[in-house]
A protein has these predicted regions:
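N-terminal signal-anchor transmembrane alpha helix
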Residues: 1-17
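Membrane-interface loop-to-helix entry segments
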Residues: 36-51, 94-107
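Interfacial segments of alpha-helical transmembrane regions
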Residues: 1-5, 67-78, 125-133
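Juxtamembrane boundary at the C-terminal end of a transmembrane helix
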Residues: 139-150
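Hydrophobic alpha-helical segments of small multi-pass membrane proteins
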Residues: 74-87, 101-114, 132-136
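Helix-adjacent hinge/juxtasegments
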Residues: 50-88
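Membrane-helix boundary connector in multi-pass membrane proteins
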Residues: 91-96, 113-126
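Membrane-interface helix termini and inter-helical loops of multi-pass transporters
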Residues: 20-34, 65, 149
């Protein structure tokens, strides 16, 4: 499943910005009460990226049967993935909590659009993205709380 591997590799590139910000700056922030320990994020994102890769594969294999909807779905997926990586760059790399909140808001909307577009091609692909939407919803709440507290 090349799609899973590619999504994992591209997704892991956001860890560069995360690692940059996890030093003294992040440690100095007032943390929301519901913020999980830092070690939780790696395994969760690894699982989510694998699920995203599986969803991409399901859509990709339908590209000849449904070229218009599949191409649209993959394009929207690519757009949301750019915003996923941008959030790490803005929140951790640039240390801009408020701007991160704006980015994650756009990301959330693009994930909803991706789920809708994937559902038009393969319902299973859309379902595979639901945990991702739930996690980003939680991450947006955390981002908001970091913004309020700091």
């Amino acid at each position: 499943m090349l799609a899973v591997l590619l999504v994992e590799i591209v997704g892991a590139s956001g860890a560069v910005f995360t690692a940059q910000g996890l030093g003294a700056w992040y440690a100095s922030l007032e943390r929301p009460a519901v913020a999980p320990p830092n070690w939780v994020f790696g395994p969760v994102w690894t699982a989510l990226f694998a699920s995203m890769g599986g969803a991409v594969w399901l859509v990709w294999r339908r590209i000849e049967a449904a070229p218009g909807p599949a191409r649209l779905a993959l394009g929207v997926f690519a757009a949301q993935f750019v915003f996923n990586l941008a959030w790490s760059a803005v929140f951790f790399g640039m240390r801009e909590i408020g701007a991160g909140l704006a980015v994650i808001g756009v990301l959330w909307a693009l994930i909803v659009a991706t789920i809708w577009a994937f559902d038009r091609v393969d319902r299973r692909a859309a379902i595979l993205l639901v945990p991702y939407l739930l996690w980003v919803t939680f991450a947006a709440y955390l981002n908001y709380q970091f913004w309020v507290l700091n």
